[in-house]
Amino acid sequence: MLNFFRLRNGFYVSWRADANSQIEGKVDIRPIQHIYGDWKDIVYFGHEPAAWLARMQTFKIVDFFADEACVGLFHTAAQNPELHYYDFGSDTSPLGVDFQGYLALLAHTLGYRYWQLLLLELEAPTPATRPWHPQRPQTQELVQGLQQYVPGFDLQAFVARYDAVRLPTPA
């Protein structure tokens, strides 16, 4: 992660299929000084239950891809590199990848809106079979959109890349 930020301290790209379209994508990899800054009033507000608040005060946004959701990491003494999906107002969900793996998968999707949901289904506790096909209706729609709007998107190539960059699961 540090090598990336030595070369490029964050980047922002957004796109829309056309002016009237809901088909869009966004990547907002925050500069490192923002990642490790204070996320009060965005990630947490200070009035939440103590255990949840203590945990979320360590959550640092890495990709602020939507106003209501992001991908980040927990900056703790354990130094676990795994990224997590956070839909504001709910809990975080592990994605099974570190920053380098996330960037590799991002390249397949061009930041298509909510592509991270594919990772949530791939990271599900039950091992997925290969070839993999999404089970959730929302993920099925996402794959259809990716195939239609992201040139050359291949679901099985994406899954193979995920398998290659996926962090080992703790025993």
Regions found by a protein language model. Name each.
Residues 1-69, 158-171:
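A surface-exposed partner-binding patch
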Residues 8, 65, 106-109, 122:
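Generic structural signal for hydrophobic core residues of well-folded globular domains
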Residues 64, 76, 92-95:
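Short amphipathic alpha-helix initiation/capping segments at coil-to-helix junctions
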Residues 116, 122-171:
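Charge-dense, low-complexity intrinsically disordered regions
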Residues 10-14, 114-119:
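Short, solvent-exposed secondary-structure capping/transition elements
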Residues 83-117:
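Compact, glycine/acidic-enriched structural inserts
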Residues 78-81:
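Long, low-complexity acidic/proline-rich regions
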Residues 69-76:
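Short, surface-exposed beta-strand/loop micro-motifs that present aromatic residues
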